[in-house]
Amino acid sequence: IIVVLEKPKKLPKRPNFSCGPCVKRPGWSLDNLKSFEVLGRSHRSQICLNYLNDVIKLTKETLDIPEDFKVAIVPGSNTGAFEMALWSMIGPLPVDALAWETFGSGWVNDIKNQLKINDLRIHKADYGNIPDLSLIGDDTDICFTWNGTTSGVKVPNANWISRKRKGITFCDATSAIYSQKLDWEKLDVTTFSW
């Protein structure tokens, strides 16, 4: 079902759209940084390690990530994180890959054409729709985007992911992480940018 809405009469103060959380908050400035002493320093320096550890701790607390889950900060934003996970973990089992917008389609392309996973089932839907989630297997790895930034379509919840699954769930949660409740117990690898 496609719903056509009226064009809004009220525009945002900053009407430039970009996918993901790219824009700084109103009033943000470099002057808000606690310290410039970390600029140009190695991430291995003690001061930078302290900042990184603080950010990781706050991220877990803010998002209610279970205590036994690991959080890491990696280069390359969400794309870097998702690619690292795919390239190092996907493949021994069959793969169910879902796509209904730009980012999910990109992950499907990588799995099919770069990683060349042979036992791949692609669940694709047109923009504005979502694939039939009841077709996802219990004995497969699952690759999906929780909320399709470019299409505005999201999975309703994680009920379609079996608690008895044998595979790994790879979830691109960039546009969902701070706005929707995620079922962490069903998400093995969850990536996002901020």
Predicted segments — roles?
Residues 32-84, 88, 100-110:
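Conserved N-terminal alpha-helix of the aminotransferase class I/II PLP-enzyme fold
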Residues 31-34, 55-59, 131, 165-171:
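A broad, low-specificity signal for short, low-complexity segments enriched in glycine/proline
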Residues 8, 62-65, 115:
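Short, conserved catalytic or adaptor-binding loops enriched in Gly and charged residues
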Residues 12-14, 69, 139:
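Sequence-level motif detector for i,i+2 pairs with an aromatic at +2
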Residues 18, 73, 191-192:
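Structural signal for conserved beta-strand scaffold positions within catalytic alpha/beta enzyme cores
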Residues 81-194:
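Conserved PLP-enzyme active-site core in the AAT-like
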Residues 19-22, 48, 143, 171:
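Generic recognition of cysteine residues
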Residues 1-46:
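N-terminal "arm"/small-domain region of PLP-dependent enzymes with the aminotransferase-like
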